[in-house]
Swiss-Prot record:
GO molecular function term, any single one: cytokine activity
Ranges in a coiled coil: none
SS bond list: C70-C76, C99-C109
Family: Belongs to the IL-6 superfamily.
Phenotype on disruption: Animals have normal T-cell numbers in the lamina propria but the T(H)17 cells are reduced by about 10-fold. They develop mature-onset obesity and have disturbed carbohydrate and lipid metabolism, increased leptin levels and decreased responsiveness to leptin treatment. Animals have impaired liver regeneration characterized by liver necrosis and failure. Mutants infected with influenza virus do not show a significant difference on germinal center B cells compared to wild-types.
Organism domain of life: Eukaryota
Expression triggers: In activated follicular B cells, expression is induced early after influenza virus infection. Plasma levels are highly increased upon exercise, due to enhanced production by contracting skeletal muscles.
Nucleotide-binding recorded as keyword: no
Record carries keyword DNA-binding: no
The name this protein goes by in its record: Interleukin-6
Quaternary assembly: Component of a hexamer of two molecules each of IL6, IL6R and IL6ST; first binds to IL6R to associate with the signaling subunit IL6ST. Interacts with IL6R (via the N-terminal ectodomain); this interaction may be affected by IL6R-binding with SORL1, hence decreasing IL6 cis signaling. Interacts with SORL1 (via the N-terminal ectodomain); this interaction leads to IL6 internalization and lysosomal degradation. May form a trimeric complex with the soluble SORL1 ectodomain and soluble IL6R receptor; this interaction might stabilize circulating IL6, hence promoting IL6 trans signaling.
C-alpha cells in the first residue's frame, strides 16, 4: 500500500497532517457523507512515511493512555477480563482481509481499515464521555487523530460506497450496551477498547509498507 505524491514534503507537513481534519468530523454520530465524501478540489496527498508516522504517533498515544489507566501495572495492561465480562466484539483485521503479506490485496485491505476505523468511532466516543480531566483531553485527541486516519485511508479507496458504515440502530444498541455497564467495569472496558485499537493499528501500519 503506497501513498504517493508528486512533490516532496516539508518537515512540518506531519503537523499539517495532524491538523487537517481537527474540525471536519462530528463527535456524536457517524454519517456516510461525514467520512466518505471529499469535495476539496486539491485534496492533500500523503506519503507512506507520513501515514506511517501518524499511525505510530496514534499507537504511542494509546500505549500512554493504557499505562496511565493502569498506573503502569503490567498485569493490568495485559488483562482481558473486560472481554469476558461484556462479550465485546471490536473490529479486528483477519487473515482474509487482504492486509497481510500472504494474500495481500490493497483494495480489500483499504476497505477493511476504513470500515474498521469507522466502527471504532462509537467506542472512542464512549471512552471520551467516561473519562475525566486530562484523560478526557487525551481521549479527545486520540479520537481526532483516528478520524484523520479515516480521512486519509478513505482517499485511497476506489469505491467509497463499499465502505461499511455502522447503522444508526447498531450504533444505538452499542451505545446502550456500553452505557448500561456498571461503574467498576467501565475502566476495564476502556482498556480493552484501547488494546483492540492498538492491535488493529499495528496490522494497519504493517499493511502500509506492502508493495
Amino acid at each position: 500500500m503506497k501513498f504517493l505524491s508528486a512533490r516532496d514534503f516539508h518537515p512540518v507537513a506531519f503537523l499539517g497532517l495532524m491538523l487537517v481534519t481537527t474540525t471536519a468530523f462530528p463527535t456524536s454520530q457517524v454519517r456516510r457523507g461525514d467520512f466518505t465524501e471529499d469535495t476539496t478540489p486539491n485534496r492533500p496527498v500523503y506519503t507512506t512515511s507520513q501515514v506511517g508516522g501518524l499511525i505510530t504517533h496514534v499507537l504511542w498515544e494509546i500505549v500512554e493512555m493504557r499505562k496511565e489507566l493502569c498506573n503502569g501495572n503490567s498485569d493490568c495492561m495485559n488483562n482481558d477480563d473486560a472481554l469476558a465480562e461484556n462479550n465485546l466484539k471490536l473490529p479486528e483485521i483477519q487473515r482474509n482481509d487482504g492486509c497481510y503479506q500472504t494474500g495481500y490485496n490493497q483494495e480489500i485491505c483499504l476497505l477493511k481499515i476504513s470500515s474498521g476505523l469507522l466502527e471504532y468511532h462509537s467506542y472512542l466516543e464512549y471512552m471520551k464521555n467516561n473519562l475525566k480531566d486530562n484523560k478526557k483531553d487525551k481521549a479527545r485527541v486520540l479520537q481526532r487523530d483516528t478520524e484523520t486516519l479515516i480521512h486519509i485511508f478513505n482517499q485511497e479507496v476506489k469505491d467509497l460506497h463499499k465502505i461499511v458504515l455502522p447503522t444508526p440502530i447498531s450504533n444505538a444498541l452499542l451505545t446502550d450496551k456500553l452505557e448500561s455497564q456498571k461503574e467498576w467495569l467501565r475502566t476495564k472496558t476502556i482498556q480493552f477498547i484501547l488494546k483492540s485499537l492498538e492491535e488493529f493499528l499495528k496490522v494497519t501500519l504493517r499493511s502500509t509498507r506492502q508493495t
